[in-house]
Amino acid sequence: MKQHRICATDIILLVINVLFLLGMLFWFGPCDHVKEDGSFMNCHWAGVVLAGTAAVMTVISLAHLLIPDTGMKAGLSAALVPCSVFAFLVPGNLISLCMMNTMRCRSVMTPAAMVCSALVVITAAVDIAVQLRRKAK
């Protein structure tokens, strides 16, 4: 029986996604402005969607770390790509944000989501290549 080896990309994917999740919950989220009628602004919902997407990506990354099968790891990395693209498109494209560029949703949340998403896509692509190369051996 083969021993389960943890690859560097396993850890990198998990760290990026945990930081993405914690960032959206505590550091990178939108401001707490509420409309005059008491309802939340659109940027609040963009932050909620990003936190939820980051949570799903974190669970996928944790499964990626724990599962020893290389084919399954490649599939989990492939599943991270559309999640990351979705997270990249949410702020400002799928959910509109505040109009002022100086607001927290545009100046902090959007760049953080884009950077984290791009890092996950790059790392997942590298991991897919690594896992498929291992499977071919």
Task: Give the role of each language-model region.
Residues 1-20, 130-134:
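Cytosolic juxtamembrane helix and N-cap/initiation of the first transmembrane helix
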Residues 19-30, 82-97:
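C-terminal TM-helix exit segments that contain a strictly Trp-centered aromatic cap at the helix terminus
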Residues 29-33, 66-73, 96-100, 132-136:
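Transmembrane helix-loop junctions in multipass membrane proteins, especially transporters and channels
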Residues 30-47, 90-115:
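Interfacial non-cytosolic loop connecting adjacent transmembrane helices
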Residues 49-64, 117-122:
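Hydrophobic alpha-helical transmembrane segments
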Residues 63-85:
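Loop-to-transmembrane helix junctions at the membrane interface
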Residues 116-137:
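Membrane-water interface at the C-terminal end of transmembrane alpha helices
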